[in-house]
């Protein structure tokens, strides 16, 4: 499903259409969100931006890249959780029109198409970056990317192609044929990996570490005992049974990895 990503940066012109600001989320009236619709060529994309009204006029920004299912409620929930930490978080739309896939086969095809068209990946993640940094309450100099499964791989490769990200945090993301680059030297990388993830063999881990060491990139690689692929998503156990995939939710790994991310942020990307 995953292919080596090699492509060149290019500039984008974009038009943003912001939708209504949503009502308060959950029980915290300070937590706000809005939908944003934007275009690349003739295709529309639907992002989701969350923030907390806590007296800070400008905050660091976080791109949240969804799993291969698409921009669903899970990705938006993670954006809300990051907003609660005093960041502005944007759950991005990598497939267009806010598409969410219901079957593993369709999701795999969609993700595979993105990875087999690296210019498309670059165009879409860069556009999302431009949307986030255009927000008045975002500190344009301090942006990171957080990704889950498919999204973790996208986030890593976004840094590798030169997107100016201070931090990348990948949760159970694929590492197949990953190639680092000189352009990643200023990006700190956190990998949160399930030790029992059948989709991330030791050879991929060894290659990843070798690539990072080659360019002197600061990174931490966390392994969570007994955790499989998609260990942070409570829906994954049901999906694994439904589609006969070796994935399952792991509460201990979910909580530990979230705390590891917070600790990593405190070192390299504190909310200001």
Over which residues does each language-model region extend?
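Bacterial N-terminal signal peptides
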Residues: 8-18
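Acidic catalytic loop of the alpha/beta-hydrolase fold
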Residues: 196-200, 229-230
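Serine-hydrolase catalytic machinery in alpha/beta-hydrolase-like enzymes
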Residues: 35-137, 234-248
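Short alpha-helix in the alpha/beta-hydrolase fold that links the catalytic acid
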Residues: 78, 201-211
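C-terminal catalytic histidine-bearing segment of alpha/beta-hydrolase fold enzymes
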Residues: 215-272
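Short, proline-enriched alpha-helix->beta-strand connector loops that line the catalytic pocket
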Residues: 184-189, 215-218
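Short beta-strand/loop motif that positions the catalytic acidic residue
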Residues: 191-193
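Primarily recognizes the serine-hydrolase "nucleophile elbow" in alpha/beta-hydrolase
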Residues: 125-185
